[in-house]
Amino acid sequence: MQKTGGSTYIISLPKQWADKVGITTGMRVGIRPQPDGNLLISPNISERTPKRLVIDVTDLEGDSLEREIIAAYLAGNDVIELNSPKILADRKKVIRSVCYKLVGTEIVEETSKRVVIQNLLNQSDISVKKTTQRMFLIAGSMFRDSVKALRTSDFDLASDVEQRDDEVDRLFLVISRQFRSVVCGSGFVNESDISVDEYHDLRMAATPIERIADHAQKIARLILSKKPRYDDTTLRIIEEMSRKAERISRESVDALFSSESGPANKAIEEHADLIRMISDFSNTFRPESVDDPISLRVIVDSIGRVADYSVNIAEIAINASVAGRN
């Protein structure tokens, strides 16, 4: 460490590292301060070449084609080129559908033999905190509205809940891509108030949030397909269970973003009470007394699963809180 002038410090980069990453005299490097006080140095940040992947899709179709494109996106590729002697219409339909699921992607070139997908999103514009919070807001509203649709037999609302799951999936994939980019060293943690460890915690929490949305969608789909109707007493019990599950999820997420273990421990305690309530209901209700008892069991099970996934978030929050004290 050397000091020049009144406020400038100079450090030397290790030659072995500079040679390995190809840094030469006159090149620019990116330097970004991290919340823990460290400096993150990235070579050639201003000269980054777009990452490109070429995929032969001749033997890919349907779900396998979709999985291949999503995997390429998550791997951080900026350009995904799909080639085949002839790309049939059904494959192009799958490709367009996948592009809708991936935030920032556009088809920039399309012929009978080639489709080029480009990610136009600047990853420095993404806030993992805001993205995770938005995921939870959507998932929470989906769960709340799915139970409301059951009470009111509002099939339009149930259909809307089903469609909202796509947005949660889109946000989940963005977070996954960003996290992998940071871990692999090809991206920065852009927020000044978040460390790589916190980034990891939010990525971990995004999975149970996505599962909460899945169970809300499951209830909505059941309403649309089975159109179950239950008496007022049964509906009140379902609503009480769902309110408890929603409160547990809200407390868990609040604990995650506040880095406090108190709300998380409270959520875990309330989860135990809800599980007992669900168990008592399942053991006492008579299938012959309700319309479509199978659907009722599925709904109650999904409510319990929402609470279970919320506890997963609470446990992540507790771990993060303890780690932050070191």
Regions inferred by a protein language model and the residue ranges of each:
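Cytosolic, long alpha-helical scaffolding segments
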Residues: 1, 6-8, 12-326
